[in-house]
Amino acid sequence: MRLLPEWLLLLFGPWLLRKVISGQIVESGRPQYLDLRPAMAGGGARGQQLPVPASSEGLNPVRSWSWAWPANHTGALARPGAAGGPPVPRTKRKPSIKAARAKKIFGWGDFYFRVHTLKFSLLVTGKIVDHVNGTFSVYFRHNSSSLGNLSVSIVPPSKRVEFGGVWLPGPAPHPLQSTLALEGVLPGLGPPLGMAGQGLGGNLGGALAGPLGGALGVPGAKESRAFNCHVEYEKTNRARKHRPCLYDPSQVCFTEHTQSQAAWLCAKPFKVICIFVSFLSFDYKLVQKVCPDYNFQSEHPYFG
């Protein structure tokens, strides 16, 4: 029985030691730091306890050490928009059908033709813009340096491309005039465009009577009523430029430079329209029809 305390000490000694050590750790609550530097004059003694260092953020002291597993915050972090969680991802908005269809069908130079010789140069460019609301606009630009008559018009696909019958009978055409005309009304129906081409010197529409004289052939009655267009804007500028004559460089000749712009607003419904261009000068004839694909948006131009 005298050996009982020794046996109890051997049995419960390690357990008591662990309890004492754990009690010290719990009592301290955080690690202690000792100042091993030499004591300074008027300072504290060696072995003085230093203050607890602050955290890296400089706000709060370092939290007490714990062997317990940290709380599971993955659920809170996984929720978009939660505190400390990832930002809410933005959903990509699909462009509306109206905004997507508002893109222009053609651009400047998407259909054009160019003629360049020693005697003259001719360039016609155009574009078609769909306004989605059932209307579309047709725009033209024209530059020429020749004494001749140019006509650009909207025609149905059935329009024949030929030299014969292009110029209607009427007053003698002025060689220096050019026009951007709309073809789509019979002569007896009157001008459909509602305005006179003051800068062009004649009425647009019908037979284009006036100083211009010449015009394109007029389609049939059914085709003529299929077009519903009117002129929104038109302008023509002319200038003379002097240059040495080709036949005699010692003499000075002049060339007539013409710049024309026109915009037509047309209403549907019709699926295909064509652009008819005719140019007539003293020594050159040109007739061309371009029918852009209205339902195909292409980045490549239509060359004439």
Swiss-Prot record:
Region: II, residue numbers? 24-84
Q: Could you say which residues form the signal peptide?
A: 1-23
Q: GO CC terms for this protein?
A: extracellular region; GABA-ergic synapse; synapse
Give its localization.
Secreted
Protein name, per record: Neurexophilin-4
Q: What would be the name of the gene that encodes this protein?
A: Nxph4
Where are the annotated glycans?
N72, N133, N143, N149
Segments of this protein annotated with the region IV (linker domain): 164-220
Q: Which family does it belong to?
A: Belongs to the neurexophilin family.
Functional description taken from the UniProt entry: May be signaling molecules that resemble neuropeptides and that act by binding to alpha-neurexins and possibly other receptors.
Q: Posttranslational modification, per the record?
A: May be proteolytically processed in neuron-like cells.
Tissue specificity field = Brain and kidney.
Give the residue ranges for region: III. 85-163
Q: What InterPro entries does the database record attribute to this sequence?
A: Nxph, NXPH/NXPE
Recall the GO molecular function terms of this protein's record. signaling receptor binding
GO BP field: modulation of chemical synaptic transmission
What broad class describes the main subcellular location of this protein?
A: secreted
Residue numbers spanned by region V (Cys-rich): 221-304
Write down the species: Rattus norvegicus (Rat)
Arranged from A to Z, the UniProt key words for this protein are: Glycoprotein, Secreted, Signal
